[in-house]
């Protein structure tokens, strides 16, 4: 824990002492998020997972309240947001999209859950037994029951103030776009289908 304190203090110093004033968006309380006995790690490569390494900078997060019951969860160093897409995949993004605006419900015994609602289903921030993201999607009114082990969150406050150097987003994009390779593949398939259907009709004529 002393090592983490040193790391967090260093982060706060670097952000406060060496960031241009126009990039400072305000102070945020630092937290760690514990799910299924692992710390939620938000990585700069766009992945989110769990780790037992409590001193990792990937686990130093900012919980930013934007409205009642709605939050942003952001890594304090990389400025990457925790996001959930419509398929239930959890990922990290430097661009703030609607996928990253999370609902938060506080439960008993100091636990809470974070989720998105898509098409009448709740998609939860969740980790499996090995610390990988677990897709948990349930109808809106269905209780978690046995799924609570993967979704219950305990927030651990860190007794430091971080001066954020993350740029304030100018807009919120709608959702995560498909990777370029997927878009290219879909376009190729569409062109192939259209071409062969056209040839078929020409042959019939």
Swiss-Prot record:
Record-given protein name: Fibroblast growth factor homolog
Family of the protein in this entry: Belongs to the heparin-binding growth factors family.
GO molecular function: growth factor activity
GN (gene name): FGF
Alphabetical keyword list: Growth factor, Signal
Record carries keyword Signal: yes
Signal peptide range in chain numbering: 1-17
Species name: Orgyia pseudotsugata multicapsid polyhedrosis virus (OpMNPV)
């Amino acid at each position: 824990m002393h090592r983490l304190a040193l790391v967090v203090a260093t982060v706060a110093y670097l952000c406060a002492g060496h960031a241009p004033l126009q990039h400072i968006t305000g102070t945020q309380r630092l937290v760690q998020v514990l799910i299924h006995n692992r710390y939620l790690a938000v990585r700069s490569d766009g992945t989110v997972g769990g780790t037992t390494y409590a001193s990792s900078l990937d686990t130093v997060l900012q919980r930013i309240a934007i409205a009642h019951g709605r939050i942003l969860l952001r890594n304090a160093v990389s400025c990457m947001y925790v996001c959930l897409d419509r398929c239930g995949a959890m990922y990290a993004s430097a661009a703030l999209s609607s996928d990253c605006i999370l609902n938060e419900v506080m439960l008993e015994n100091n636990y809470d859950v974070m989720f998105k609602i898509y098409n009448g289903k709740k998609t939860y921030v969740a980790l499996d037994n090995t610390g990988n993201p677990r897709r948990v999607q349930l109808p809106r009114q269905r209780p978690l029951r046995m799924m609570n082990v993967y979704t219950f969150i305990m927030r651990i406050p860190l007794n430091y103030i971080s001066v954020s150097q993350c740029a304030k987003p100018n807009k919120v994009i709608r959702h995560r776009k498909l990777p370029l390779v997927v878009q290219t593949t879909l376009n190729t398939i569409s062109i192939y289908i259209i071409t062969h259907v056209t040839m078929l009709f020409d042959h019939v004529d």
